Amino acid sequence: MIHNGSTPRRFVFGNNDANERIVPEEYKYNSSMINELIKQNKDLHKQVTEKQEEIDRLNVLIGSFRAKLIKYTELNKKMQRDQQEQQHNRHQSFESKPRYKAEFTSESSSPVSNERDSEYLQIKKNNRHDENKIDDIYQKLELLTNLVNDAIHKQNNGEQREPSNFNSRIVSDDDIIISESQEFKQLQDQIDLLKRKLLIKKENELRKLSLNKELADLMDELSMNSSPSANQNIDPYSELSSRPKSGQQRRTNEDQQSLHCEHCHLKSHTQSHPSEPRFVNLKESLETPTPTPTQTPRKLKREKDTNVADKQYSLW
């Protein structure tokens, strides 16, 4: 049953794994770190605003206390000035009057009237002195107020700059994380490239060694095949045709012994005097004569005997 105002749920039939994407662990870790940093940023912003409100309240209290302090200092200075003026007037009144009158007035209650008279007589002088003092006081107060205002402005500017510096520091942390992940990826790519190059280099070296080995084997076989072919070219065909079968067998045995001796002599010579590597034309050496249909059975038999000798020579 669907209630009013509620939306029906959608059910997806089939394999849910196909709809989900595989997210690497690095991205998950980075997202969790970013969420934590955002949360810390919000908490710190709250703390900063609370501290700012406290600072504003304290600034208000400081301003009120400062005004009271200025007021009381002015009252204190005024009272001090009044006392100094009274003392000065008394001293002048005592000096201006005769001795007997001063002695009489000191014991009686007439000093108040004398002070008033002295003040009345010296109004201009006292007013000038007071005006100078007041001007000095006002100048000092202006200097103090300017200094206090400058200090307050500097403090407020510093407090306003702290959140901006904090925000920039947070942004710089995110940038550092992203840059580090990019650097790691670049290093991984470089390592994979170097591994690939090393594998290719090793494969080329192995291939080069195998080809050199095959070339050396072919050269050895060609050198071994060239020596019996030279001996066969020296023997004339007339002697082979005139001799009987027993003579041919004797000659094959002698050829085998001579080939064995030559092989031993060649081996000892190569062991005592290693020769330089020979460069043979592979195309010319691989070209073997093919039997033509005009050859006689005697020639075919002779070539068969030479092939048997070559095989025995290779076995030796």
Curated annotation (Swiss-Prot):
UniProt subcellular location: Nucleus; Cytoplasm, Cytoskeleton, Microtubule organizing center, Spindle pole body
UniProt region (Disordered), positions on chain: 78-118, 224-257, 281-316
Coiled coil: 32-223
Origin superkingdom: Eukaryota
Keyword Nucleus: yes
Transmembrane segments: none
Keywords from the named record: Coiled coil, Cytoplasm, Cytoskeleton, Nucleus
Pfam family, one: Spc42p
One GO CC term on file: spindle pole body
Biased composition (Basic and acidic residues): 78-104
Function comment: Forms a polymeric layer at the periphery of the spindle pole body (SPB) central plaque which has an essential function during SPB duplication and may facilitate attachment of the SPB to the nuclear membrane.
Family indicated by similarity: Belongs to the SPC42 family.
Name of the protein described by the UniProt record: Spindle pole body component SPC42
Protein's organism: Kluyveromyces lactis (strain ATCC 8585 / CBS 2359 / DSM 70799 / NBRC 1267 / NRRL Y-1140 / WM37)
